[in-house]
């Protein structure tokens, strides 16, 4: 089963609203999904913090277990809208501090 992280379209006609979901690649675009990990509202202004909302820990989990992100979701990640690197740097920093504390 190939798992994809993709956008599912909701909302009214000419008022799109997207949910960022983890779904089987064979499932319909707006159909059955495994987990909802965020949302994207293109109708909000670009500087609005609620335009793209993602559970970064769940996104990171699904990417680590082999889920493939679609082109648009990867664009969000590369643009820095979804900040995965900051989360991983915080975790690494805590691990380094913990190891140094044990050695001392």
From Swiss-Prot:
SUPFAM superfamilies listed in its UniProt record: Ribosomal protein S16
A cellular component term, taken from the record's GO annotations: cytoplasm
Keywords in alphabetical order, please.
Answer: Ribonucleoprotein, Ribosomal protein
**Gene Ontology molecular function:** structural constituent of ribosome
| InterPro entries to which the protein is assigned, alphabetical | Ribosomal_bS16 (IPR000307), Ribosomal_bS16_CS (IPR020592), Ribosomal_bS16_dom_sf (IPR023803)
Q: Name one Pfam family in it.
A: Ribosomal_S16
GO BP term (any one): translation
**PANTHER family reported in the protein's UniProt record:** 30S RIBOSOMAL PROTEIN S16, SMALL RIBOSOMAL SUBUNIT PROTEIN BS16M
UniProt similarity note: Belongs to the bacterial ribosomal protein bS16 family.
Q: Name it.
A: Small ribosomal subunit protein bS16
Instruction: Please report the organism this UniProt entry assigns to the protein.
Output: Wolbachia pipientis subsp. Culex pipiens (strain wPip)
Question: Could you read off the lineage of the organism from its UniProt record?
Answer: Bacteria, Pseudomonadati, Pseudomonadota, Alphaproteobacteria, Rickettsiales
């Amino acid at each position: 089963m190939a798992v994809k992280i993709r956008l599912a379209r909701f909302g009214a006609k000419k008022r799109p609203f997207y949910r960022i979901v983890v779904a089987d690649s064979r499932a319909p675009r707006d159909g059955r999904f495994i987990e909802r990990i965020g949302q994207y509202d293109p109708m909000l202004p670009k500087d609005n913090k609620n335009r793209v909302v993602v559970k970064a820990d769940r996104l990171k989990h699904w990417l680590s277990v082999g889920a493939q992100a679609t082109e648009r979701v990867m664009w969000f990640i590369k643009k820095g809208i979804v900040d995965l690197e900051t989360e991983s740097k915080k975790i690494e920093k805590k691990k380094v501090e913990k190891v140094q504390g044990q050695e001392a």
